[in-house]
Amino acid sequence: MHVLILGGGVVGVTSAYYLARAGHQVTVLERQPGAGLETSFANAGQVSPGYSAPWAAPGIPVKALRWLMMRHRPLVLWPRLEPRLYAWLTRMLANCTEEAYRRNKGRMVRLAEYSRDALRDLRTETGIAYDHREKGTLQLFRTRKQLDHVGDDTRVLDAYGVPYTVLDPAGCIAAEPALAAVRDVFVGGLRLPGDETGDAHLFTQRLAALCESLGVTFRYGTAIARLHHAGDRVTAVETADGALLRADAYVAALGSYTPALLRPLGIALPVYPVKGYSLTLPITDAEAAPVSTVMDETYKVAITRLGDRIRVGGTAELAGFSNALRGPRRETLARSVQDLFPAGGDLDKASFWTGLRPMTPDGTPIVGGTRVGNLFTNTGHGTLGWTMACGSGRLLADLVSGRAPEIASDDLALGRYAA
């Protein structure tokens, strides 16, 4: 079977890898000159099944109002006359109940754990290297209130058998020794030893090369104009230069840009771009830098070691498809890393980046078939595209191939929004 994958980010490329391994002829269309050059380029670097949780959670509406008042706020909302944004926010608010949070977090942890295992298998099979470490995540709490609410997450972790340890300040320092220099800043933490870190861009580029060795064709610099369809079948992809490309099956993995492509087919995909930012700074003192990932719970900022660099990622900005770099967001990221690892890296030499995360209202990606028989989606991963990429690609390959998936997947498909 010939499969056309639309999008060459980490999700599209992992989909290509598993489909090629399943014996399919695969072509990837990507508008950029290479793989992984948009949302996958400089993300936070976490592979964090244990930290997988929906943003829609009990108490979030009140917290969001408080965040919007903070100087270094983790949430930024630019007022816009955009009906799709407010429809998306309304759906998200509807998921801020205890029942919905448990259901959505359970789905996310299921896929993320599967994906982490798939990544480990892939690494064993191929020897792929991407500045990865297997040293866990430390969610760091600055306030007693944050620590007291840790049970909201550990109950779901217990249900899915995800290992964790709740730590006092001494335990946090044992996990991340550089925190000893700022021990008065935090009161405790939650350590997730099964989490990993790695450079998603480097991984995507190297996996694309492995895909080519399996016969996958990459057509870079190819922008997609629209899908042609007849009845319940896609018949072709029309590119920006007017070419028509045909296949037996099609996979939409265009991140935040997927809904606009599918809308003319009558498919309403509840995915909205949530803008994130990152700083990447060279390490100046290895002993003063993080060992793995530290998640600053107050500012919702992840600080990750990637080889000889520190990646600082965070912020949720609702600003449509704007890619403008905004100084206040840089200040928030800098504040977090300066608070926790003041001597670890050189901020004067930091690179500043932004990307658009494709978010769903319930936090769970949309992986599976659609009402158009030969069209599949693999999008909506939000902040967890890197965490969930391998599992989503492997799951998608099973679904396209007509094989029984290795994990429950009906509640990951678009149909859950019709339920």
UniProtKB/Swiss-Prot annotation:
Cofactor dependence: FAD
Main enzyme class: oxidoreductase
Listed GO biological process terms: D-alanine catabolic process
Pathway of action: Amino-acid degradation; D-alanine degradation; NH(3) and pyruvate from D-alanine: step 1/1
Residues given in the record as FAD binding sites: 3-17
Domain of life: Bacteria
GO MF: D-amino-acid dehydrogenase activity
Membrane-traversing stretches: none
Any one annotated GO CC term: cytoplasm
Catalytic activity: a D-alpha-amino acid + A + H2O = a 2-oxocarboxylate + AH2 + NH4(+)
EC numbers: 1.4.99.-
Gene3D superfamilies according to UniProt: D-Amino Acid Oxidase, subunit A, domain 2, FAD/NAD(P)-binding domain
Keywords: FAD, Flavoprotein, Oxidoreductase
Family membership: Belongs to the DadA oxidoreductase family.
Function: Oxidative deamination of D-amino acids.
NCBIfam families named in the record: PRK00711.1 (NF001933)
Descriptive protein name: D-amino acid dehydrogenase
Organism: Methylobacterium radiotolerans (strain ATCC 27329 / DSM 1819 / JCM 2831 / NBRC 15690 / NCIMB 10815 / 0-1)
